[in-house]
Regions:
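Membrane-spanning helices that line or support transport/gating and their immediate boundary helices
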Residues: 55, 59, 112-120, 178-186
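Nucleotide and nucleotide-moiety/phosphate-recognizing core
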Residues: 28
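A generic "structured core" feature
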Residues: 47-52, 59, 63
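C-terminal membrane-associated helical module and adjoining short loops/tails
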Residues: 1-14, 19, 24-25, 35, ...
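Interfacial helix-loop-helix junctions of multi-pass membrane proteins
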Residues: 67, 121-123
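Multi-pass membrane catalytic core of lipid/isoprenoid biosynthesis enzymes
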Residues: 17, 22, 46, 63-115, ...
Length: 193
């Protein structure tokens, strides 16, 4: 296959890591369909492995210069699916408030929609540093809420909820920041007319 074909480089290391993250998602969901320490521990382990692939795929994509269109699409999709589906599965276990899940998922859908509209107009809205911090807090929160129980005198449910409240604040703050950027960018042409 020629290097300049649309499919060139699809089977690179970063994309393979992203696919591995997608493969972890059903394991997390199946584990969380059961209550108890061991299913929660397994869910946390798989979620943690998936989160590590998220760090590594970005690192290798930049280092190897192997950023692909597929990777740009799949990486954020895998992130959103992992976190959103994990949060949804934690609801029946009474480990996370429903309204928090609704707020976070609604924000993700709204921002994804805004970015799609911007891209269709040839405009790139830069990722906010707040969004990166939000993602980190969400990941730690999900790990804590999956573990849920007390280990080594640490109540992981409390740890998870503490990080979740921080993630919620950054979710709303970064969401407002995206809407502000979107409004500024799309109001410029109107002012020039």
């Amino acid at each position: 296959m020629k290097p300049d074909t649309p499919y060139a480089g699809i089977a690179n290391l970063p994309n393979t890591l992203t696919f591995a993250r997608l493969v972890c998602i059903p394991g997390v969901l199946i584990s969380l369909s059961f209550s108890g320490r061991w299913p929660g521990f397994l869910a946390a382990l798989l979620f943690g492995l998936a989160s590590i692939t998220d760090i590594l795929d970005g690192y290798f994509a930049r280092r190897q210069g192997s950023v692909t269109v597929l990777g740009k699409f799949l990486d954020p999709l895998a992130d959103k699916l992992l976190v959103s589906m994990t949060m949804i599965m934690l609801i029946p276990l009474s480990r996370i408030p429903v309204w928090v899940v609704i707020v976070i998922i609604t924000r993700e859908m709204a921002i994804t929609g805004l970015r799609a509209v911007a891209v269709s107009e040839g405009i790139i809205i830069q990722a906010s540093p707040l969004g990166k911090y939000k993602t980190i807090l969400q990941a730690v929160a999900m790990l804590g809420l999956c573990l849920h129980y007390t280990y080594f005198r640490v109540n992981f449910h409390v740890v998870g909820m503490t990080f979740l409240w921080g993630a919620l604040v950054l979710t709303l703050w970064s969401g407002w920041d995206y809407f502000r950027q979107f409004n500024q960018v799309f109001s410029l042409p109107k002012e020039k007319k």
